[in-house]
Amino acid sequence: MAEFKRLLAQLCCDEKQEEELLSYASACGNDGADGLVLIDNAKTDEEHEFHIGLIRKMARAIDIPIFAGGRVKRLEDVKKYLYAGAKGVFLDVSVEENVDMIKEAADRFGSEKIFIRLNDAAQTKRIPEYAQLGASMAFLGEEVLPEAAEVIRTMEEQMHYYVMSSSGETEALAKELK
């Protein structure tokens, strides 16, 4: 199997930065990113709806897939992200209600569209459970990588992984997975 790396650009939404975010998304696509991870940190329903609209605009403007998540409180939120143009939705499994939602979301929308986001090393022990429930991909915060490496090696046929690094240490992080 040929080895390759995928570059996913990550951005957190802020309502006040719509033009900058659209410009950034376009630049990511033009500069070779393989996808865009959009983290919706909305605190209100109005902000959340704004971010849904932003996904819709980005999906029309760029040719790379968008993966969205962050503020998922119910299955309706998953549907809104997907209908807005996200290729997949990640559920933050530090929120137990999101773990409970994995199977229902995978059954309704397809497991290829349901991902998990791990930011806590304790969650890595549950990766097999998340895969069994229907999650097909995991976004790993760099802080969980050392603990996740062994689980990833045993589960790589069932789930794909992407490391989300904000430190720029992606080369060192990638070596941890080998």
How would you describe each model-predicted region?
Residues 1-64, 75-76, 116, 120-139, ...:
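Conserved N-terminal beta1-alpha1 strand-loop-helix module at the mouth
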Residues 23-26, 94, 111, 136, ...:
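Generic serine detector
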Residues 42, 73, 95-96, 144, ...:
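Conserved beta-strand edge residues that scaffold enzyme active sites
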Residues 42-46, 69, 90:
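Conserved short-loop catalytic and cofactor-binding motifs
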Residues 61-89, 123-133, 149-178:
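Catalytic cores of alpha/beta
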Residues 70, 91-94, 141-142:
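Short beta->alpha connector loops at strand-helix junctions that form conserved
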Residues 78-120:
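Hydrophobic, well-structured mid-protein blocks that either form specific transmembrane helices
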Residues 99-115, 126-137, 174-177:
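Contiguous hydrophobic segments
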